[in-house]
Amino acid sequence: MMKRDECLKVLARHRTDEIVVAVYKAAQDWIHIAPSDLNYTFTGAMGQGSSHALGLALGRPDKRVVVLDGDGSLLMNLGSLVTIANAAPKNFMHCVCENGTYETNGAVPIPTHGSFTFTGMAREAGYVNTYTFDNLDDWDRNLDTLLKEDGPILVDLKVEPGEDYPENFPRLYSTEHRDRFRKALAES
C-alpha cells in the first residue's frame, strides 16, 4: 500500500507537459504537490473526472491526459469506462486512487470493496491495458513507460491517505485558475 501523496509525488517527478485532471482528495493533494497551469482540478462533481478528461483527450489528441480519479468517484460514473473505451483516445491514462472509501464523504467504506477490481472492469469495458501498483518503487520504475503507452489505459493505485494538505477551494474554483488553464492549453 502506498501513501497517496507519495504516489502523486512520483507522478510529479515524471511529468513533462501532460494535462492532469484531478478530482476531490487527489485534487487537493495535487495542487500542493505539482502546481501547474495545465492542471484541471475540481471537486463537486463526483464521478465526472474521467468524463472531463475524455473531453480534453479528444480535444487535444497531441497531448497526454492523465486523470487522477478516486475509487468512490469512478463508482459514481462506471458508464464512463465504456464511453472512454469506445472513443479509444490513445493519449488517455486513467489513474484510480483506490483506498476502499468514499473519502471525501467522511471515509464511508465502499460496499463489497475487494470483491471486484477496477482493472477487471476497465478490461471488460475495452481499455487497451490495465495495471495495478501497491509499491512506490514499482510505480516509479514503470511510470515513464506508462506515460508513453497508447491508451486508454487504467492504472489502479492502491493507496491510503498521506499528508493532510489544506483544502484550497478558492484555488480550485477561481476564475484566475480557469483562465490560466485555458491559456496554457491554447499555447501548449
Where are these regions (language model features)?
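Feature captures the catalytic ectodomains and active-site-proximal regions of enzymes
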Residues: 1
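Thiamine diphosphate
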Residues: 4-9, 19, 31-187
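Extracellular glycan-recognition modules
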Residues: 15-17
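Short, polar loop motifs at secondary-structure junctions
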Residues: 24-27
